[in-house]
From Swiss-Prot:
Keywords: Disulfide bond, Glycoprotein, Hemagglutinin, Lectin, Protease inhibitor, Serine protease inhibitor, Toxin. The lineage of its organism: Eukaryota, Viridiplantae, Streptophyta, Embryophyta, Tracheophyta. Transmembrane segments: none annotated. This is Bark lectin isoform 1. Gene3D superfamilies: 2.80.10.50.
Length: 165
């Protein structure tokens, strides 16, 4: 069970390379604000930055499947003035919608859900807080093969690992 308010890493079910907002990556020369993409780290065993899941029903202690929730990057280090809450925004550079930070707590546009996907899970984005929702998958861009999260027809199978400490 995933507990409300507890930090977890989101990891692809087939890899140990996790995710991090661009503004926290050490190889970034300057912050990527305001469009701070959630990108996959290039090195296996780099598990990324943990997140906290907050269900729409704040009285729940366990995050339920297929219910609205906010995803909040859990890091004391932050270089952008925008919030740490995940949302989906349009990007002309990346030609479409991307998962980014700068969302608003408990508001339309910042709702995601965790759903079963075979033996794993998947994230879906529900912009209106209800259907239709769209699977969150991986998009690859550039010659370096930078991988970032975006609404896609093919979901990314993920698992969750509780952050220690």
């Amino acid at each position: 069970a995933i507990l409300t308010g507890v930090p977890y890493y989101i990891l692809p079910s087939t890899s140990r390379a996790g995710f991090s907002p661009d503004n926290l990556r050490k190889n970034t020369s300057q912050p990527s604000c305001p469009l701070d993409l959630i990108t996959q780290l290039r090195f296996p065993r780099r598990i990324g930055v943990p997140v906290i899941f907050t269900p729409q029903n704040s009285s729940l202690k366990v995050v339920p499947l297929s219910h609205n929730l906010n995803i909040h990057t859990c890091s004391d280090l932050w270089f952008c003035p925008e919030s740490k809450i995940w949302t989906v925004k349009s990007s002309s550079i990346h030609r479409g919608l991307v998962v980014t930070t700068g969302g608003t707590f408990r508001s339309l546009g910042s709702w995601f859900r965790i759903e079963r996907h075979g033996d794993s899970y998947k994230l879906v984005h529900c912009p209106r807080g209800s259907t239709p929702c769209r699977d969150v998958g991986i998009e690859t861009v550039g010659g370096g093969g930078r991988r970032y999260l975006a609404p896609r027809d093919r979901p990314l199978a993920v698992r969750f690992t509780r952050a220690s400490g």
